[in-house]
């Protein structure tokens, strides 16, 4: 399978994907990038966004990631995401509930509370995830 790229997507919670693919497109902090088999090695950071896994010209898997790192080596591409979800497993209703719960917690915190930044970051991630589901 020398004509395929080995791709792994890992979050702190679990490995979301590992397999041989044709092409991966990911949201780098310097811009979206694509990786094919035999790509030149590099490492970069990721921003929140959708990782698309292609077989031929068809997107077979979509994952929403919250930051992390992408490492391209001769062995393939590994993405270590701060948080990631398979978009085929996510539901808009569940995400809406999570957003509302986070917003309610945010209202309970004082303006100077350090937990506010964590909640605001989580709300931003969830809203991006919700937007990715709509597309």
UniProtKB/Swiss-Prot annotation:
Family from the record: Belongs to the ATPase epsilon chain family.
| SUPFAM superfamilies listed in its UniProt record | Epsilon subunit of F1F0-ATP synthase N-terminal domain (SSF51344)
Q: What is this protein called?
A: ATP synthase epsilon chain
Q: Which HAMAP family match?
A: ATP_synth_epsil_bac
Q: Which compartment or compartments is the protein found in?
A: Cell inner membrane
Instruction: Describe, as the record does, how this protein assembles with itself and its partners.
Output: F-type ATPases have 2 components, CF(1) - the catalytic core - and CF(0) - the membrane proton channel. CF(1) has five subunits: alpha(3), beta(3), gamma(1), delta(1), epsilon(1). CF(0) has three main subunits: a, b and c.
The main place the protein resides is membrane
Molecular function (GO) terms for this protein are: ATP binding; proton-transporting ATP synthase activity, rotational mechanism
Q: What does this protein do?
A: Produces ATP from ADP in the presence of a proton gradient across the membrane.
What GO cellular-component annotations does this UniProt entry give? plasma membrane; proton-transporting ATP synthase complex
Q: Which UniProt keywords apply?
A: ATP synthesis, Cell inner membrane, Cell membrane, CF(1), Hydrogen ion transport, Ion transport, Membrane, Transport
Please spell out the taxonomic lineage of the organism that makes this protein.
Bacteria, Pseudomonadati, Pseudomonadota, Alphaproteobacteria, Hyphomonadales
Membrane topology term reads:
Peripheral membrane protein
């Amino acid at each position: 399978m020398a004509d395929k790229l080995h791709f792994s997507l890992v979050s702190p919670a679990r490995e979301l994907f590992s397999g041989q693919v044709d092409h991966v497109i990911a949201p780098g902090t310097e811009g979206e990038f694509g990786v094919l088999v035999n790509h030149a090695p590099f490492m970069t950071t990721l921003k929140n966004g959708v990782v698309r896994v292609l077989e031929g010209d068809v997107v077979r898997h979509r994952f929403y990631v919250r930051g992390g790192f992408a490492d391209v080596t001769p062995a393939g591409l590994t993405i270590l995401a701060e948080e990631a979800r398979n978009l085929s497993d996510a539901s808009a209703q569940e995400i809406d509930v999570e957003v509302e719960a986070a917003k309610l917690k945010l209202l309970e915190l004082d303006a100077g509370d350090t937990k506010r930044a964590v909640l605001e970051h989580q709300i931003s991630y969830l809203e991006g995830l919700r937007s990715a589901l709509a597309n």
